[in-house]
A protein has these predicted regions:
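Canonical Radical SAM [4Fe-4S] cluster-binding loop centered on the CxxxCxxC motif
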Residues: 80-109
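Flexible, acidic/Gly-rich N-terminal and inter-domain linker regions that tether
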Residues: 2-85, 390, 398, 406-430, ...
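Conserved, mostly hydrophobic/aromatic
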Residues: 77, 90, 129, 186, ...
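Residue-level signature of tetratricopeptide-repeat
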Residues: 373-374
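Alpha-helical ds-nucleic-acid-binding substructure associated with the helix-hairpin-helix region
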Residues: 290-293, 307-345
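Conserved AdoMet/S-adenosylmethionine-binding subsite of the radical SAM
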Residues: 112-117, 135-318
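C-terminal extensions
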Residues: 325-355, 381-439
Length: 439
């Protein structure tokens, strides 16, 4: 073969080989990115890492899959599976063993190179990696750890890495994964063990909770070591998260929220994600016959989750024994206020911060501003609007200079207040039927 412009035949052979290899990798990418889209537990990263000279990537940046840093900035992640081949046959999963779908598997080296290539082209700023279970949990986990280790040690990748821990993986592999990952997660999937065994007979709560405990031990031990040694290695500094599927089984919202509350009691659990059940396997008679995912219910659970995390509500207050399912027409905070008119009206010029948080239309930021502002002046409707209070809701539950008793939830009755607040919403939903509104 003749040399062209100083290039040897070996050079062109290598070029053809690399082109063929990349085409194969991209075919795998199409299959495995599609298989990964049903995992929602990567909406926030919760970490910012400092860069060092020579490092590649960053956890901080601006809008693949989007996540958010601790300071609220958006980063894009390569959301991918190492393989969608799986030995399990979970009823709710598109990648179940018995499904006839396109299958693919990356080698750890291929996925490492793909991640770096995507980063260098400014497509991504991090990696969210999950996998089907091949052979056994330890074999799969070891290959996932190899990807994270090579990214950190060989390529000096400093971007965000979220690793899904495989249920049943050994403590040694979970410990090694935590040294390279920013966040780790183990999906609970089904909120009760009885239904988990029904839909995923190969799994158990023990195999799920055990890796959770390993992660928690690693995070707490790392935090203790860093109090004594400044440069001690960090272990999953953004903590851990989990995900539950909503609507695949008969659990009540109360059951789901009580489980979430117990998970948040763990010191390293940062987020619980709720995924509306998508009927990807309609032929399985163990699953409910749904036309579409229960998006409104999913949204209400996220709102209830927010109330538990930031507003001081308990799970058994949001969904009690008499109302174990969340109201799909109104948000959980308003539903609680209408069930408990005895707590209202609240005088915004005197009420404590905790009670202000329970008023519909008042958020965390607004409550703080109210407490600060009333030191210097008496608050009025206008000043509350300027602070950011949603007066359309709050007017029925508060007292201020212009709002006095006589027009609140107790005088108008909760049923009437509910009708007044939901009438505009019904008109909007009639115009936008089928579209879930965000506000």
């Amino acid at each position: 073969m003749r040399k062209i412009a100083g290039r040897s035949p070996v050079f062109f052979e290598k070029k053809r080989y690399l082109a063929a290899m990349k085409a194969t990798v991209l075919e795998k990418f199409k299959v495995l990115a599609e298989s990964a889209k049903y995992d929602v537990s990567c909406a926030s990263s919760g970490v910012t890492r400092r860069s060092r000279p020579g490092d590649v990537g960053s956890t901080a940046g601006w809008g693949i899959c989007h996540s958010f840093t601790a300071d609220g900035r958006c980063v894009s992640l390569l959301k991918i599976m190492l393989t969608n081949v799986c030995i399990y046959d979970c009823a709710y999963c598109i990648n179940r063993r018995s499904n006839d779908i396109p299958r693919a598997a990356f080698t750890p080296g291929e996925l490492t190179e793909l991640t770096i290539e995507f980063f260098r082209r400014n497509y991504i700023e991090g990696l969210f990696l999950s996998s089907g279970v091949v052979r056994n949990p330890d074999y799969t986990m070891e290959r996932m750890v190899r990807v994270a280790r090579d990214l950190r040690t060989v390529h000096r990748f400093n971007g965000y890495i979220h690793l899904k821990s495989i249920p049943g993986a050994s403590p040694e592999l979970v410990a090694e994964a935590g040294r390279y990952a920013d966040r780790m997660s183990v999906n609970i999937e089904i909120p009760t063990e009885r239904n988990l065994r029904l839909l995923a007979p190969d799994k158990s709560y023990e195999s799920i909770y055990r890796p959770m405990s390993y992660i928690q031990q690693g995070v707490l031990q790392s935090a203790e070591e860093r109090t004594r040694f400044r440069h001690a290695p960090r272990f999953a500094p953004a903590g851990q998260s989990t995900q539950m599927i909503v609507g695949a089984t008969d659990e009540r919202d109360r059951d789901i929220l009580l489980l979430s509350s117990s998970l948040y009691a763990r010191p390293t659990m940062k987020r619980v994600y709720y995924s509306g059940f998508i009927p990807v396997n309609p032929y399985d008679k163990r699953l409910p016959a749904l036309d579409k995912a229960p998006l409104v219910r999913e949204n209400r659970l996220y709102q209830a989750d927010w109330l538990m995390r930031f507003y001081g509500f308990r799970a058994d207050e949001i969904a009690d024994e008499r109302t174990p399912r969340l109201d799909l027409e109104i948000d959980p905070k308003l539903a609680w206020a209408l069930r408990h008119p005895e707590f209202f009206p609240v005088d915004v010029n005197r009420a404590d911060y905790e009670m202000l948080l329970r008023v519909p239309g008042i958020g965390v930021k607004s409550a703080r501003l109210i407490v600060t502002s009333r030191r210097y002046r008496t608050l009025t409707q206008q000043s509350l609007r300027q602070i950011g209070v949603v007066m359309k809701k709050a007017q029925y539950f508060i007292l201020c200079r212009e709002l006095t008793s006589g027009q609140g939830v107790n005088e108008l009755r909760p049923e009437q207040v509910r009708r007044l607040l939901t009438a505009p919403q019904r008109r909007r939903s009639d115009k936008n039927e089928g579209q879930l509104t965000l506000f």
